[in-house]
Amino acid sequence: MMKRFGKTLLALTLAGSVAGMAQAADNKVLHVYNWSDYIAPDTLEKFTKETGIKVVYDVYDSNEVLEAKLLAGKSGYDVVVPSNSFLAKQIKAGVYQKLDKSKLPNWKNLNKDLMHTLEVSDPGNEHAIPYMWGTIGIGYNPDKVKAAFGDNAPVDSWDLVFKPENIQKLKQCGVSFLDSPTEILPAALHYLGYKPDTDNPKELKAAEELFLKIRPYVTYFHSSKYISDLANGNICVAIGYSGDIYQAKSRAEEAKNKVTVKYNIPKEGAGSFFDMVAIPKDAENTEGALAFVNFLMKPEIMAEITDVVQFPNGNAAATPLVSEAIRNDPGIYPSEEVMKKLYTFPDLPAKTQRAMTRSWTKIKSGK
């Protein structure tokens, strides 16, 4: 979901490997495909040091890109990170291996309640483990929004971007949306009072029409560019992933560029997503992949990743190790009251997904 480490990162092989990893280390290269900027800077190096396995690490910024590679076959990857809303149909399509839990002793660290919830997409939790989760909400530059809007900008509401008279005021300072129809159109549906997983053509059309009304005031649709643009003050509002916006905030603070970034979960509610770790059916290094999955389930490793990417994780044993500032931030770890207003992204039927994609193409073109 971000771009800090570049398109491809080859983790250098370091000397040594631990006992019990000999079989995994027989195959010395592991190909991992993950969301951009979604791992700690030294995670891969630590894995290589422990196992002797090099990691070739590529990134993407949409589920659609990953799914196209998986369904085409021979993706070339050993580990991938699909969102839960795409997982069920990909499992049905037979693109993933079942996990050999006998080789995953760190499985015990996972959040049991979350694992139960995730069985809706993956019965028996046979194919994937939770990596990170988060929300899709409003990232904004309070100074630029105030300059454009005045003191009464509804920064805690979808009204900020879904009412034409509001978003029109923000055009001069820049507004971006995720380029993800299956995550953003449900936000419009929810705002209009419809179910986010509706397959009603009239309701889907209403969401499309809402976006066409605000389209002239949207600067761009992209699923990662907004991070640097928010951090640098190039845009003033981004509808994006919670952790990405917090990373933009951190980058601005590190740069000391006098840019302030904040994040709100809209009071009407918002979508929540779960990103999973899975092994493709055609993985060439299954043993190395299992070693990597087990490594990610180490509490100290997962806590370090959360501290960097600022998304909450699905590892119960890791939560106490996450920095207090992140654990106590309601934008990252929402309160129970806010959690009740969140919805999960549905596993949409192919017909509905195609309809959303057609609408999205129309919305982006503005026609």
From Swiss-Prot:
Keywords (A to Z) from UniProt: Disulfide bond, Periplasm, Signal, Transport
Transmembrane segments: none
Description of the deletion phenotype: No change in type 3 secretion system (T3SS) induction.
Residues that, per the record, bind putrescine: 36-37, 244, 275
Disulfide bonds: 173-236
Pfam families, per the entry: SBP_bac_8 (PF13416)
GO MF entries: putrescine binding
UniProt-annotated location(s): Periplasm
GO CC, any one term: periplasmic space
Signal sequence residues: 1-24
Annotated GO biological process: polyamine transport
Entry's family note: Belongs to the bacterial solute-binding protein PotD/PotF family.
Its job: Putrescine-binding protein probably required for putrescine uptake into cells. Binds putrescine with high affinity (KD=3 nM), spermidine with relatively low affinity (KD=6.8 uM). Does not bind cadaverine or spermine. Putrescine binding induces large inter-domain conformational changes.
Name used for this protein in its record: Putrescine-binding periplasmic protein SpuD
Provenance organism: Pseudomonas aeruginosa (strain ATCC 15692 / DSM 22644 / CIP 104116 / JCM 14847 / LMG 12228 / 1C / PRS 101 / PAO1)
